[in-house]
C-alpha cells in the first residue's frame, strides 16, 4: 500500500495574531466551542503524553471533562500506568486534534490530583454503569479473559444493587496546569499558522508566531 501520496490541502481558515485572545484559556474555549458546534465526534478527546522518571514515554487518548483558567481535568484509575508515570514525573502534554476544522491545540503543563470532594462531585454525575466499571477494572493489569471482567462487573453490580455507588479510593481526577499552549491552523501549501503562548514569571503570557 502506497501511503506517500496520502495528503489533504488545508483551505478552511487562517489564523492571524489579531485573531488571538491574549488569554490562551479563552482562545482554547473559543476553538473548543466551535469544535462542539461543528458536531465533531468527541471533541473533548485528547491525547495525553506522560513519561516515566527514566524518560520512557507513553501516549493514550482520554476525555477532557471540564476546564477553566485553573487547568484541564480528566479522570482515571489512580493505579493505572498513566497515574504511576504522573507520580514519577508530573510534567505532561496534551493534544486536541480537530481534523475537520484543520486545527490542533498542544498544551504542556504539570498534573496533580484533584481533591476527593471534587472527584466525588464528578463521579456522582456518571451513568451507573460507568460507576460500576470504575470499581471492577484494575486498569492496565493483565487479565486472562473478557469473561473474567464481565463476571467481576456482575459481582460489583450485585454488591451495590441498593443505593448509591461510593467513590472508589483508587479512582479520581487530575488537573493539568498549563505553562505552554500552541494553536495550529492548517493552511495551503503547508504554510500553516502556528502561535505559541508561554507563561511568564509575572503570570502573563508571551505570544509568538512559529514557523510551520
Swiss-Prot record:
PROSITE patterns with a match to the protein in the record: PYRIDOX_OXIDASE
Classification via InterPro entries: Pyridox_Oxase, Pyridox_Oxase_CS, Pyridox_Oxase_N, Pyridoxamine_oxidase_dimer_C, Split_barrel_FMN-bd
PANTHER family hit by this protein: PYRIDOXINE-5'-PHOSPHATE OXIDASE, PYRIDOXINE-5-PHOSPHATE OXIDASE
Function according to Swiss-Prot or TrEMBL: Catalyzes the oxidation of either pyridoxine 5'-phosphate (PNP) or pyridoxamine 5'-phosphate (PMP) into pyridoxal 5'-phosphate (PLP).
Complexes and interactors: Homodimer.
Record-listed FMN binding positions: 60-65, 75-76, 82, 104, 139-140, 184, 194
SUPFAM superfamilies linked to this entry: FMN-binding split barrel (SSF50475)
Similarity comment: family membership: Belongs to the pyridoxamine 5'-phosphate oxidase family.
Gene name as annotated: pdxH
Keyword annotations from UniProtKB, A to Z: Flavoprotein, FMN, Oxidoreductase, Pyridoxine biosynthesis
GO MF annotation terms: FMN binding; pyridoxamine phosphate oxidase activity
Entry note: cofactor: Binds 1 FMN per subunit.
Protein's GO biological process: pyridoxine biosynthetic process
Reaction equations catalysed: pyridoxamine 5'-phosphate + O2 + H2O = pyridoxal 5'-phosphate + H2O2 + NH4(+); pyridoxine 5'-phosphate + O2 = pyridoxal 5'-phosphate + H2O2
Cofactor: FMN
Binding residue positions for substrate: 7-10, 65, 122, 126, 130, 190-192
Record EC number: 1.4.3.5
Signal peptide coordinates: none
Designated name of the protein: Pyridoxine/pyridoxamine 5'-phosphate oxidase
Keyword Oxidoreductase: yes
Amino acid at each position: 500500500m502506497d501511503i506517500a501520496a496520502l495528503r489533504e490541502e488545508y483551505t478552511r481558515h487562517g489564523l492571524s495574531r489579531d485573531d488571538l485572545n491574549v488569554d490562551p484559556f479563552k482562545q482554547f474555549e473559543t476553538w473548543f466551542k466551535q469544535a462542539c458546534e461543528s458536531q465533531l465526534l468527541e471533541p473533548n478527546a485528547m491525547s495525553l503524553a506522560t513519561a516515566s522518571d527514566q524518560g520512557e514515554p507513553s501516549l493514550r487518548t482520554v476525555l477532557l471533562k471540564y476546564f477553566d483558567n485553573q487547568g484541564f481535568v480528566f479522570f482515571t484509575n489512580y493505579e493505572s500506568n498513566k497515574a504511576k508515570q504522573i507520580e514519577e514525573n508530573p510534567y505532561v502534554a496534551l493534544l486536541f486534534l480537530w481534523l475537520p476544522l484543520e486545527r490542533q491545540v498542544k498544551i504542556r503543563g504539570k498534573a496533580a490530583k484533584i481533591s476527593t470532594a471534587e472527584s466525588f462531585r464528578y463521579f456522582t454525575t456518571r451513568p451507573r454503569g460507568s460507576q460500576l466499571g470504575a470499581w471492577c477494572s484494575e486498569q492496565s493489569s493483565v487479565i486472562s479473559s473478557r469473561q473474567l471482567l464481565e463476571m467481576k462487573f456482575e459481582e460489583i453490580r450485585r454488591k451495590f444493587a441498593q443505593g448509591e455507588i461510593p467513590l472508589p479510593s483508587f479512582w479520581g481526577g487530575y488537573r493539568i496546569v498549563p505553562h505552554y499552549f500552541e494553536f495550529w491552523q492548517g493552511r495551503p501549501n503547508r504554510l500553516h499558522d502556528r502561535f505559541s503562548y508561554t507563561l511568564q514569571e509575572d503570570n502573563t503570557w508571551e505570544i509568538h508566531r512559529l514557523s510551520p
